[in-house]
């Protein structure tokens, strides 16, 4: 039996409300951008299949609500995640300060060896930037995780962010995980899909 992909990776986008998680997802999955901002209610997800080192990788990317009242809903989505992208807004110091809290959430709910990536979004707003690139890079280095500044609006580094994450997960899983490794995840990941629409009203 030959599946249409070699790997299935579940990724999460987390971070404060308004940092641009949904815009990053839209840019990567659909190559679109919208100025109209609507808060994600609970959880949304999109799928995109990529090629990496001759392998087909299906990325299932979950966009979680940043608001406090949805924390209990979204905590269950940490389970089974292979990679988590922590997003802050380079023009919002508070969203950067809260990265530490989001990392604590990962430690609390996600599997121990989950891959992490720190992303500073809205890099196109250069005149409003308050979080220094060097500061964020040093912080990410101290944690041993990759760091990128992105702009969903200009599509800067968006592709690179998701590709970096996919490459890191693939490297961690090793060649042995390719053919059979994703099948148990299919069972785990197929159940929340039904809840995504109705469970958050």
Curated annotation (Swiss-Prot):
Keyword Hydrolase set for record: yes
Cell compartments where the protein resides: Cytoplasm; Membrane; Preautophagosomal structure membrane; Cytoplasm, Perinuclear region
Cofactor entry: Mg(2+)
Lipid attachment in record (S-geranylgeranyl cysteine): 200-201
Membrane topology value: Lipid-anchor
Record keyword Lyase present: no
Biological process per Gene Ontology, one example term: autophagosome assembly
Region (Disordered): 173-201
EC number of this enzyme: 3.6.5.2
CDD domains registered for this protein in UniProt: Rab1_Ypt1 (cd01869)
PANTHER family per record: RAS-RELATED PROTEIN RAB
Binding partners and assembly: Interacts with MICAL1 and MICAL2. Interacts (in GTP-bound form) with MICALCL, MICAL1 and MILCAL3. Interacts with GDI1; the interaction requires the GDP-bound state. Interacts with CHM/REP1; the interaction requires the GDP-bound form and is necessary for prenylation by GGTase II. Interacts with RabGAP TBC1D20. Interacts (in GDP-bound form) with lipid phosphatase MTMR6 (via GRAM domain); the interaction regulates MTMR6 recruitment to the endoplasmic reticulum-Golgi intermediate compartment. Interacts (in GDP-bound form) with lipid phosphatase MTMR7.
Name the record gives this protein: Ras-related protein Rab-1B
UniProt source species: Bos taurus (Bovine)
């Amino acid at each position: 039996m030959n599946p249409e992909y070699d790997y299935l990776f579940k990724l999460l986008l987390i971070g404060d409300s308004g940092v641009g998680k949904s815009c990053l997802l839209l840019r990567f999955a659909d190559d679109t951008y919208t100025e109209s901002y609507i808060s994600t209610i609970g959880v949304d997800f999109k799928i995109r299949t990529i090629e990496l080192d001759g392998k087909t990788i299906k990325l299932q990317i979950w966009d979680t609500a940043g608001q406090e009242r949805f924390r209990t809903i979204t905590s269950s989505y940490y389970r089974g995640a292979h990679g988590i992208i922590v997003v802050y807004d380079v023009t919002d110091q508070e969203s950067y300060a809260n990265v530490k809290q989001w990392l604590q959430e990962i430690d609390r709910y996600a599997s121990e060896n989950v891959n992490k990536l720190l992303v500073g979004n809205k890099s196109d707003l250069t005149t409003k930037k308050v979080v220094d690139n060097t500061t964020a890079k040093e912080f990410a280095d101290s944690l041993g995780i990759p760091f990128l500044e992105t702009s969903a609006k200009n599509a800067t580094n968006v592709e690179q962010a998701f590709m970096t994450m996919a490459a890191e997960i693939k490297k961690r899983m090793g060649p042995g995980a390719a053919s059979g490794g994703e099948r148990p995840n299919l069972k785990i990941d197929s159940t929340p899909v039904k809840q995504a629409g109705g469970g958050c009203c």
